[in-house]
């Protein structure tokens, strides 16, 4: 099998692909550098940052609407906001939009509830532009890696979940980008790689995202050997789309891939925005709660995390979307979301 044949969706009518129309409340983030295998050059990273900021900034106040730090203590502030939230209340706080439907509507009314990060061509992203890196000054190299980290952080803290269709090879920082999103999708034969060790530049930064999606030992093997793996062995990290057997055309695999992407985006775009945002913040926050022998319940942190998450569930239950969802369920009708 040639290398071209081995790339998933490689040369499968993806090169000239026109991105499908998105449902309402969804928007694209476009990684646009196909001539350079979608390498993350300084200019491309600046463009990704700009697109993210546009989709995360309140049109009304000009405020950047990102999730708060993943720190358990912030739940105290959210509880105070939730307890005093009322239709006629004028009291607000920095994060009131996470629990108050009125504040959400005021700040995020024109912003998307789901983002879709896509590139075109047979390679999703080959990572940093090594040719450019070699020509940059040390200060510019530091700027490139700092900008890369900022882009990943904006994705992680986006209230709108970020879906990432990985239509081709994802390596190094390109894999980091894909796995920093909330929901990545790939065909079973899609190749992933941390190739830096082969050129004396271990993929230390990309490994931070990968090791948070798959077991650390598996990540370290990829980091150490630089060997490529397929999505089929990374099912914990990616929604893997099986390629149809006995397909008469490679377009069949592309259709299965696009069908799954559309299904996921439609489902998320049809969901209430505020619960998804609060749920995302709570999920990543509780993962960082470890057992504390002195001021917690010790052990692996499960009991502390469960107790803390119960407080977030109470916030969910007080919210307008939860009340609407429960009412719709009991009345056997579709909910009319507030956010």
Where are the language model's segments positioned?
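C-terminal long alpha-helix characteristic of the crotonase
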Residues: 185-190, 238-308, 314-320, 337-339
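Structural motif
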Residues: 118, 158, 165-166
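Catalytic-core regions built around general acid/base machinery
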Residues: 51, 103-107, 147-159
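A short acidic, glycine-rich active-site loop
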Residues: 137-146
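Acidic, divalent-metal-coordinating active-site segment for phosphoryl/phosphodiester hydrolysis
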Residues: 226-233
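CoA-thioester-processing core
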Residues: 151, 155, 165, 171-223, ...
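Conserved CoA-thioester-binding segment of acyl-CoA-metabolizing enzymes
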Residues: 1-118
């Amino acid at each position: 099998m040639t290398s071209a044949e081995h790339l998933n969706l490689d040369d499968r009518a993806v090169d000239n692909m026109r991105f499908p129309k998105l449902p309402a409340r969804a928007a694209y983030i476009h990684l646009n550098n196909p001539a350079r295998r979608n390498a993350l050059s300084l200019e491309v990273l600046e463009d990704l940052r700009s697109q993210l900021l546009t989709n995360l900034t309140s049109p009304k106040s000009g405020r950047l609407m990102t999730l708060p730090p993943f720190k358990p203590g912030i739940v105290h502030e959210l509880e105070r906001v939730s307890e005093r939230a009322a239709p006629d209340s004028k009291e607000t706080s920095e994060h009131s939009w996470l629990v108050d439907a009125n504040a959400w509507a005021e700040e995020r009314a024109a912003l998307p509830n789901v983002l879709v990060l896509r590139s075109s061509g047979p390679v999703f992203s080959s990572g940093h532009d090594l040719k450019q890196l070699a020509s940059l000054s040390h200060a510019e190299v530091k700027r490139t890696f700092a900008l890369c980290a900022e882009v990943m952080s904006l994705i992680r803290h986006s209230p709108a979940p970020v879906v990432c269709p990985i239509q081709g090879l994802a390596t190094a920082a390109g894999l980091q980008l894909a796995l920093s999103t909330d929901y990545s999708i790939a065909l079973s034969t899609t190749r992933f790689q941390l190739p830096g060790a082969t050129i004396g530049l271990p993929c230390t930064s990309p490994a931070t995202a990968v090791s948070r999606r798959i077991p650390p030992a598996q990540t370290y093997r990829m980091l150490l050997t630089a060997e490529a793996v397929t999505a089929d062995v990374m099912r914990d990290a990616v929604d893997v789309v099986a390629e149809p057997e006995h397909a008469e055309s490679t377009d069949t695999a592309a259709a299965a891939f696009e069908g799954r992407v559309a299904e996921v985006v439609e489902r998320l775009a049809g969901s209430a925005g505020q619960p998804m945002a609060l749920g995302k913040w709570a999920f990543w926050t509780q993962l960082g709660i470890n057992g504390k022998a002195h001021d917690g319940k010790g052990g692996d942190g499960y009991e502390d995390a469960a107790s803390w998450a119960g407080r977030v569930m109470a916030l969910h239950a007080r919210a307008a979307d939860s009340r609407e969802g429960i009412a719709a369920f009991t009345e056997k009708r579709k909910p009319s979301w507030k956010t």
